[in-house]
């Protein structure tokens, strides 16, 4: 006897992907997440392709994963997808030390963040 299957937390027309342990501050990651929020998936991919931010590569990977989840796991139309959510969460903060003069030391904070992207399929009448 196995455990009962957990109910799906998203509606049937949505798919999501989560990128964890991204080595960037949540504030900088949110700048890139704001670019793609509410946009069509294809336009968001194009924006990330030509963004000069370092973390845009990881955001693009996460968006491509969400699109692949929508297509393969939920049978959604890739051309009708929009980025309905792109939210950023805090991760751990690694603390390192840097030697300073006179025997002192300074702290270096190395923050991590996580990104959740939810894509939703819009109907033909809504996108027209």
From Swiss-Prot:
SUPFAM superfamilies associated with the record:
Ribosomal protein L22 (SSF54843)
Name the record gives this protein: Large ribosomal subunit protein uL22
Write out the GO MF terms: rRNA binding; structural constituent of ribosome
The record describes the protein's role as:
This protein binds specifically to 23S rRNA; its binding is stimulated by other ribosomal proteins, e.g. L4, L17, and L20. It is important during the early stages of 50S assembly. It makes multiple contacts with different domains of the 23S rRNA in the assembled 50S subunit and ribosome.
Q: Which InterPro entries match?
A: Ribosomal_uL22, Ribosomal_uL22_bac/chlpt-type, Ribosomal_uL22_bac/org-type, Ribosomal_uL22_sf
Q: Which family does it belong to?
A: Belongs to the universal ribosomal protein uL22 family.
Q: What Pfam families does UniProt report for this protein, alphabetically?
A: Ribosomal_L22
Q: Does the keyword NAD apply?
A: no
| Gene Ontology CC | cytosolic large ribosomal subunit
Bilayer-spanning residue ranges: none
A Gene Ontology biological process in which this protein takes part is: translation
Please indicate if the UniProt record lists Ribonucleoprotein as a keyword.
yes
- Positions the record marks as coiled coil are none
Q: Which UniProt keywords apply?
A: Ribonucleoprotein, Ribosomal protein, RNA-binding, rRNA-binding
For this protein, the record's NCBIfam families field holds: rplV_bact
Subunit structure, interactors included:
Part of the 50S ribosomal subunit.
């Amino acid at each position: 006897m196995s455990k009962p299957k957990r109910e799906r937390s998203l509606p049937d027309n949505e798919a999501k992907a989560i990128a964890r342990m991204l080595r960037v501050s949540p504030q900088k990651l949110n700048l890139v997440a704001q670019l793609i929020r509410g946009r069509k998936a294809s336009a968001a991919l194009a924006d990330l392709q030509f963004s000069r931010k370092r973390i845009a590569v990881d955001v693009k990977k996460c968006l491509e994963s969400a699109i692949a989840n929508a297509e393969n796991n939920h049978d959604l139309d890739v051309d009708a997808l929009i980025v309905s959510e792109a939210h950023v969460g805090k991760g751990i903060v690694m603390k390192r030390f840097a030697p300073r003069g006179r025997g002192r030391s300074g702290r270096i904070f190395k923050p991590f963040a996580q990104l959740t992207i939810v894509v939703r399929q819009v109907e033909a009448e809504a996108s027209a």
